[in-house]
Amino acid sequence: TKCYKTGDRIISEACPPGQDLCYMKTWCDVFCGTRGRVIELGCTATCPTVKPHEQITCCSTDNCDPHHKMLQ
């Protein structure tokens, strides 16, 4: 599987063996009112457990985890 990953820049990379899901996790930090939600993209073996105030989406096809604002 290939997933978009966040870091210094957003890139699409092949996932490590055993990590066959892509995920997008969003949450608010102190700048949420001016910058919007923090977005984290990457690969995972299982969909992460949602914590309070987080939103997580998982999917299993190549590059299925983009956020609409990142593709503009």
UniProtKB/Swiss-Prot annotation:
It is found in: Secreted. Keywords: Acetylcholine receptor inhibiting toxin, Disulfide bond, Ion channel impairing toxin, Neurotoxin, Postsynaptic neurotoxin, Secreted, Toxin. Expressed by the venom gland. Disulfide bonds join 3-22, 15-43, 28-32, 47-58, 59-64. InterPro entries: Snake_3FTx, Snake_toxin-like_sf, Snake_toxin_con_site, Toxin_cobra-type. The keyword Cytoplasm does not apply. This is Long neurotoxin OH-5. The lineage of its organism: Eukaryota, Metazoa, Chordata, Craniata, Vertebrata.
